[in-house]
């Protein structure tokens, strides 16, 4: 049966069944939530690294533009790339600080009063920096980078079956992603 499933997917889960005394359940779930917050922040920091690598390339993809202004692609990109790199560096610094100080910030990270958000902290500002048809390929690649990095995100899932008293702790992973497997092992 496993061989038949593996022909159709490269995904599987690392599974652990744990008996948690009911009075300790909240402590256990908070511990798992902290692990998930740390894993999420690490994934978002990997996104910052991937975006920095992209914007550090010597050439970036550009779409159609009006050459009548006489401004070269390099001139049009130079300032925008510097703004993008500064934005990403600032967000990376913020998120790194949250990861470093996860213990005292746990309550705010858990209730989302502190929220590491690709959409609001990176994507929206990049859309402002790279506005216009000529820069659509740049934004398209940023979204593709986000999807690739997000695909490797590791998290820990919990569920219980009625009556067995076990907490089933699962870490879904893709078997073709070595870094994801290592992150799951570390979690």
Description of each model-found segment:
Residues 1-187:
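Noncatalytic alpha-helical scaffold of FAD-dependent oxidoreductases
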